[in-house]
């Protein structure tokens, strides 16, 4: 258990930040799942419309450190390649 006042405050802050990070991670994973579903159903027009939103979501989580920037770039690259192959 934390002994100092500042350590107790940090525990509260970490708990809050953990919830925020989980929500952001969940949001980006759901966006990836939605895009993969569009690709499986071969809905190229909808996938192209959704691509900027997905890019934005991936870069947001990469910027905040939830995932690494290389991971986000790799995901965007692979999805873009799949869309162009449709």
UniProtKB/Swiss-Prot annotation:
Keywords: Ribonucleoprotein, Ribosomal protein, RNA-binding, rRNA-binding
SUPFAM superfamilies referenced in this protein's UniProt entry, alphabetically: Ribosomal protein S20
GO cellular component annotations of the record: small ribosomal subunit
Biological processes, Gene Ontology terms: translation
Domain of life assignment: Bacteria
Coiled coil: none
Molecular-function annotations in GO: small ribosomal subunit rRNA binding; structural constituent of ribosome
InterPro entries: Ribosomal_bS20, Ribosomal_bS20_sf
Pfam families in the record: Ribosomal_S20p
NCBIfam families: S20
Family designation: Belongs to the bacterial ribosomal protein bS20 family.
Function of the molecule: Binds directly to 16S ribosomal RNA.
Protein name: Small ribosomal subunit protein bS20
Gene source species: Pelagibacter ubique (strain HTCC1062)
